[in-house]
């Protein structure tokens, strides 16, 4: 009997102290939000292949131009005060050196482009979004090594 009690107690303590248990506030979704309720088991899922908002600089199209068709575009949201972003920036430089002109890397400073970050629902930094043909292919809301990014981009080239 003592063995069963010990096992149950050990399992209970192990669950709360070994596994990362987080609490999140339930948020209602809107049509612009990429997170939508899926079913009663999965609270949210990322709706992939979502059309992206129009990006412009000084009145000219950056992404929606004809020359960007079938080009993989990497949006990298960062901030100068973010320590993980400084590590991610070196990985993004490696990515740019590896692919050269085969991809289009667009670095977006969060402090200067808050409205754009809201359009893409950026909640954490660094955030990396892969786009192709005005469609979101993948999204990473954390640090990602250059090797993982290279493998992810190879799938879509």
From Swiss-Prot:
The molecular function terms in GO held by this entry are: protein-disulfide reductase activity
- Give the record's GO CC terms: cytoplasm; membrane; mitochondrion; PTEX complex; symbiont-containing vacuole; symbiont-containing vacuole membrane
Catalytic residues (positions): 82, 85
Q: Where is the Thioredoxin domain?
A: 46-157
In terms of InterPro entries, this protein maps to: Thioredoxin-like_sf, Thioredoxin_domain
The answer to whether keyword Disulfide bond applies is yes
Q: Which PROSITE patterns match?
A: THIOREDOXIN_2
Q: Does the keyword tRNA-binding apply?
A: no
Broad class of where this protein is predominantly found: membrane
Query: Which keywords does the record carry?
Result: Disulfide bond, Electron transport, Membrane, Redox-active center, Signal, Transport
Tell me where it resides.
Parasitophorous vacuole membrane
- Please give the positions of the paired cysteines in each disulfide bond: 82-85
- CDD domains named in the record: TRX_family
Annotated membrane topology: Peripheral membrane protein
Q: How is it modified after translation?
A: The disulfide bond between Cys-82 and Cys-85 acts as a redox-active center and is reduced by thioredoxin reductase TRXR.
Query: Signal peptide position in this chain?
Result: 1-23
Task: Tell me its family.
Answer: Belongs to the thioredoxin family.
How does this chain assemble? Answer: Monomer. Component of the Plasmodium translocon of exported proteins (PTEX) complex composed of HSP101, EXP2, PTEX150, PTEX88 and TRX2.
* Protein task: Participates in various redox reactions through the reversible oxidation of its active center dithiol to a disulfide and catalyzes dithiol-disulfide exchange reactions. As part of the translocon PTEX complex, plays a role in the export of parasite proteins into the host erythrocyte. The translocon PTEX complex is a multi-protein machinery resident in the parasite parasitophorous vacuolar membrane, responsible for protein secretion into host cells.
Name of the protein: Thioredoxin 2
What organism, scientifically named, is this protein from?
Plasmodium falciparum (isolate 3D7)
């Amino acid at each position: 009997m003592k063995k069963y009690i010990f096992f149950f107690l050990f399992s209970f303590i192990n669950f709360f102290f070994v596994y990362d248990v987080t609490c999140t506030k339930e948020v209602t979704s809107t049509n612009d939000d990429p997170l939508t309720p899926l079913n009663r088991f999965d609270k949210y899922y990322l709706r992939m292949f979502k059309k992206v908002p129009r990006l412009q600089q000084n009145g000219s199209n950056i992404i929606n131009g004809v020359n960007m068709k079938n080009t993989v575009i990497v949006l990298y949201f960062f901030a100068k005060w973010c320590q993980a972003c400084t590590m991610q920036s070196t990985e993004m430089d490696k990515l740019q050196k590896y692919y050269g002109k085969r991809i289009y890397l667009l670095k977006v400073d969060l402090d200067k482009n808050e409205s754009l970050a809201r359009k893409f629902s950026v909640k954490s930094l660094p955030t990396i979004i892969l786009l192709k043909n005005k469609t979101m292919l993948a999204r990473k809301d954390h640090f990602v090594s250059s090797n993982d990014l290279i493998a992810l981009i190879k799938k879509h080239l």
